[in-house]
């Protein structure tokens, strides 16, 4: 093969050394060598950009706060500009603190709602450690979220999702169906910082080869070692189609477009919904994925015997494929063309 013959004239990295790490794996220093001159910068910059932009993680995407005071009055916070009675910080500051919580769910979980209450009589400080419940693991437990007065009780509810990169509150609000729930901007990336440098290294008589030195800091949600493995896999997947360029260039777009259209005609039974949800949808003549996403939450909620749990189940299942109720066909095709596999 031409590619294999071409690579025979290149020096390919043979050594990958893991030089340093912290006990929790959140920091790692790696050296990779030897590279042909110039390839150290090319590979280092590529890995750095992928690490910072494309490693998936968890974030809190929505919250509901109710403040209960000793005079029996209560208030549900309706927006980020509302003040929370009995709390020193304003809501915007609290939201900023919440976005800094480093957490993850159990293996395979992509969405979870947690609810809990906290009383000023028991503690005057709400910390990230209070979020560690129901299978949620928190990595910066001492982070202060809010300061409470002695006579306040807070009822709290938070939505945690799995995702990638940055998602605005406007996008997250598409998945909210209850009033007085505040959608948050979400930063899913578990990577805090990446740096790299390129040094000279010797191979035989030549000393002008590149040695790539990379340092990775994570939030603890993923180890530095797993992060660099995942980044390398992402780069490989994006470049692999170019290896068989002639075979792929003429067929890939039409194939993905066709497969995406077929998925919209797929029976909703393949979404593995509960029998109750399937029966309710059948009564509304919703039988395909395309028909389902064309409905909005309000339409489904008005259907007979269609309860909150069924709606939440459907929203969660669609969300796992990056789809949502009320989505346009064009947007759905665009999403599905990038990931056309749905479990059979």
Swiss-Prot record:
Gene3D superfamilies: 5' to 3' exonuclease, C-terminal subdomain, DNA-directed RNA polymerase, insert domain, RNA polymerase, RBP11-like subunit. One of its GO terms (cellular component) is DNA-directed RNA polymerase complex. The keyword NAD does not apply. InterPro entries: DNA-dir_RNA_pol_insert (IPR011262), DNA-dir_RNA_pol_RpoA/D/Rpb3 (IPR011263), DNA-dir_RpoA (IPR011773), RBP11-like (IPR036603), RNAP_asu_C (IPR011260), RNApol_insert_sf (IPR036643). It is an enzyme of class 2 (transferase). Residues 1-246 are annotated as: Alpha N-terminal domain (alpha-NTD). SMART domains: RPOLD (SM00662). One of its GO terms (biological process) is DNA-templated transcription. Its EC number is 2.7.7.6. Residues 259-344 are annotated as: Alpha C-terminal domain (alpha-CTD). It comes from the Bacteria. Keywords: DNA-directed RNA polymerase, Nucleotidyltransferase, Transcription, Transferase. It holds the Pfam family RNA_pol_L. GO terms for molecular function: DNA binding; DNA-directed RNA polymerase activity; protein dimerization activity. It catalyses: RNA(n) + a ribonucleoside 5'-triphosphate = RNA(n+1) + diphosphate. NCBIfam families: PRK05182.1-2 (NF003513), PRK05182.2-5 (NF003519), rpoA (TIGR02027). Belongs to the RNA polymerase alpha chain family. Homodimer. The RNAP catalytic core consists of 2 alpha, 1 beta, 1 beta' and 1 omega subunit. When a sigma factor is associated with the core the holoenzyme is formed, which can initiate transcription. DNA-dependent RNA polymerase catalyzes the transcription of DNA into RNA using the four ribonucleoside triphosphates as substrates. The N-terminal domain is essential for RNAP assembly and basal transcription, whereas the C-terminal domain is involved in interaction with transcriptional regulators and with upstream promoter elements. This is DNA-directed RNA polymerase subunit alpha. The gene is rpoA.
